[in-house]
Structures are given as structure tokens and as C-alpha cells.
């Protein structure tokens, strides 16, 4: 029972309070209050933290996360996901009174709980609702009559009311749509996207009753620049999110299939797409690896639910299978390029640029770059993964791989050496060129004329193959000439580099 009581009246048919004074309804059968919100956002990752910060600009907001280290990091003003501008985070803490905690006692006074936890799949690609179940139990331990719980996690239609609500009822002893209420507003965060930030994203909203739907819609509208779309039901809102990502997965699978066809025919796929996109209604997308915690995961939620209803979703299933095989395909195409140039694949030295699931983002969840690595590791163990965005400790912990956050050779790359490479097929890396690279790096030759041991270009001409797997901005300015061995090849997954310096691209 909350101590800061709402000004709402007791009859079960009453309207939501219109007063902004001290809101907290606390009687069984209580109607939801429409004002004076005190919010708790449960789950402070890529989605939850930016959302909590945004709400703190208008409402008293507390962030809750079971990870004590994450809470401490945030309260120190740091966000390791790099999703939230730390200036905004510090402002929220210092000026808005934004608080993060792992203590249940500190969130009991809230009257709106927003759940933003991951919804992954297991090793068999079946929906894993463990984080969602845990968060629902947390809500059940603190929720009071009149409160509202809003879910943002991506799920198949029915999860909120069929899986989550019964847990809250069991934990709290309260009755759904009599004592407490629910809403669903699916997250639309695009990790690493600094243009479409949370306040600029139009949100779908919904509620368990028309009255609650209005409260939830007004809540989000109060902080969003581009407003909301109020769905007619929670199930409709759930379905809308799951098809957003499933549609994108299917479209990318089509592009990947085209890439395989055109590569076999010796036609550049991106040239084809550029030409086709000259028609006004052609939907231009690009082939590539599909990883991360959304597009490569969410379709499995709908696939499983469809099968429960006796429907076999053939297109989505085929798209998932095709996209999941693209890492191995890239590795095989790289090997093919090496063979064509007479480069021995066995024990060759290969550099993979990027391990995160997308560009300019530290998120490595479900990255398909691993499939490139594992396929190539059947032929050579001399594989280096370089990613200036990824956390080496996180990668080691999650995947058992050692990556490097820096390459010694890169110190030789300076402005003016962007993508400097001999024409495709050239097979020499003269010592004078290496020395020039050292001079550009500010390291002169010793009195003997030999390169000093500390010269960053001393290891130039190192890799037999370079695979640009992730289009981080930093990779645009690398000195590829200094990195590539004589007759080495470059494979560009993203079509990111100048065509004249690459041997093949997806």
C-alpha cells in the first residue's frame, strides 16, 4: 500500500482524477489516475535508460535495474551503451532528480511502471521470456491499486495479457482491470542512431481499457516531438511491432538472395539496386549481415505464435534461414577471392574489421560477424578482429574471443592516405613505401637505414585478406595499403569502400 495517497475518490465507476496533486490511488477496485504520475522504468539498457531520462524532464522518474554495476555506472553519469548523451544524463540526475536503483523499496511509491527488458531467443530460436517474467514479478511485488504497468519489450501478440499479467496478479493479489491496469507501447529505439532519438520517434500506444489507453497515450504524447498512434488494443500494438522488424528481415533476405544470384552471374548487386531505385516506387534496401537483438530475433516470436494457431509462416522462416547463413557465405566468397589471386588460404593472415552487429554502435549481441570468423577458422587460426567500438572484455566474456581495440599499423595512416592502395592485382609493397608510411607517422629511419622497432608501419603488408564486416566511420580512413600483404584481397560486406580498392563486395 502506497503512503502518498491520490486525491481520487473511491467508487469503482469514478473517472480518473484530473488533479495533479499527490497522485496515488490505493483502494481495491480503484480507477486509474490520469495525472500526477510518478514513473519507474524497469530495465536500464539501450531502451530503458534513454526513455527514463526523457520522462524525467516532465515527471518524477526512477530507473530500476537488477544489475548493481549498471546502476552505479549510470549514477556516476556514464552510459557504456553510448546510447545516451552523457551531458543529458548528468543534467537529468542533477537538475531533474533522476534516480536509479536496485532496491525495490525505492520504487514502491511509483504509480506507473514501464518495463523495457530484452526479449531474446534461446539456442533453438524459441522465445525466451525469462527477463520479461522476472520484470513482471518485480512489478507484482510493488504495484498498488490504481497503478498502471506499461510494457515496451518486443513480443508476439498476447504476451502482455496472457503471460505477464497473470504473474503480476499472482505476486500482488490484485485483479487485472479492476485493481491495476496495463498498457503496451513498443520500443522503437535504433541503437547508434543519433538522428532518430527516443523523443523524435512516433510511438504506438495502447491500454487495457479505453480510459487507460487515453492515459497512456497522453503520457507519451507529453514528451514526444512527433506524437503517437493510439492502437485499438494491446494485441494490435504488440503485433504492429513484431511485423515492423519481420518485414525488414524479409526485405533484407530478398536483397541477400539477389546478391547471391548476381554474384554468381558476375554482376555487381549494388549497381543493379542503384539502377532499379530510379523507379519512383522501388524500395531500395541493401544486402548484408542481419544480427542484433531485434531484426534477427523478433521474427521467431511471431513464427512460434503462428504455429500455435496452425499457420506455417513460410516466408519469414525462409528469410531467417537465408539471413542466418550470410556470415558463412561471406567467408566462402572471401576464400574464393583468395584462391583466384593465388593466395594460400591455409594458415593465412586475415583481418576482420568490426564485430558489433551494426555500424557506429558498441552492441555485439547476436552479431553475425562471428559466423564469418568461425567459418574461416576452419582454415586458419591467424585471424585478427579489430573493432574500436566493441568492448574487448564483453566480447571475451560473451563469445570467448580476443579482439583488439587498436592496430599498430593504423598509426601509419594519416590524412591523405585514405584508402590508398595500388590498383587491384598489384603484388608489391616496396620498402620505400613502408618507410614513407613511417615518415608520415613521424617515425624516421635509424642511422643504419633500417626501420626502428617501434615504427608503427614495421608490420605493414601483414594481412592476406581484409574483410570489412561493419561500416564504422573509423574504417573509412584506414591506410589499407599499410595493412594488406602483397596480392592480398579486400572483401567489402557493406559496399562501404571505394570500389577500385576492393576485390569483391556483397
Language model regions located:
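Proteins enriched for Cys/Gly/acidic motifs involved in redox and nucleic-acid/cofactor modification
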Residues: 441-443
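Structural/interface elements that position substrates and couple domains in central-metabolism enzymes
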Residues: 2-11, 17, 25, 32-425, ...
